[in-house]
């Protein structure tokens, strides 16, 4: 298994990213690679969050959240990323992993891909959900 960080190849606007995903069988997880075109390094955090919320391309992995979920807000201050998800994330219409597992995998993916981010704080409907120790 190899890891790509959010790196720009030869100034082409092409970025490689790694995402941590939860397997549908026995709670396993793996790392999936993705190549994203046309995004700047500064927009990498938003792009990682967007890709995570879209879910995996392979049906053998559980979605982190319902595919219709869009963050109410997503911003960073210093080395911390704040993501506020709507209350609907608590009652998904599709098979997803638990919210705590979604948080763990999202945090791992964001920290791996976006070097300045060291902590992730999840909010649900504006209320604190999960946050890392940093």
UniProtKB/Swiss-Prot annotation:
It is a lipid-anchor. Keywords: Cell membrane, Lipoprotein, Membrane, Palmitate, Signal. This is Uncharacterized lipoprotein TP_0248. Residues 1-23 form the signal peptide. Disulfide bonds: none annotated. A lipid is attached at residue 24 (N-palmitoyl cysteine). Coiled coil: none annotated. Transmembrane segments: none annotated. It comes from Treponema pallidum (strain Nichols). A lipid is attached at residue 24 (S-diacylglycerol cysteine). PROSITE patterns: PROKAR_LIPOPROTEIN. It is found in: Cell membrane. One of its GO terms (cellular component) is plasma membrane. Its main location: membrane.
């Amino acid at each position: 298994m190899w890891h790509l960080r959010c790196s720009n190849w030869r100034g082409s606007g092409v970025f490689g990213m790694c995402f941590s995903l939860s397997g549908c069988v026995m709670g396993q997880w793996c790392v999936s690679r993705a190549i994203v075109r046309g995004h700047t390094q500064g927009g990498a955090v938003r792009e990682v969050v967007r890709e995570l919320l879209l879910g995996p391309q392979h049906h053998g992995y559980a979605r982190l959240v319902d595919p219709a979920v869009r963050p109410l807000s997503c911003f960073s201050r210093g080395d911390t990323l704040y993501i506020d998800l709507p209350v609907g994330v608590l009652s998904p219409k599709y098979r997803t992993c638990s919210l705590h597992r979604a948080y763990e995998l999202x945090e791992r993916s964001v920290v791996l891909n976006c070097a300045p981010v060291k902590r992730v704080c999840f909010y649900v409907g504006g209320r604190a959900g999960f946050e890392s120790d940093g």
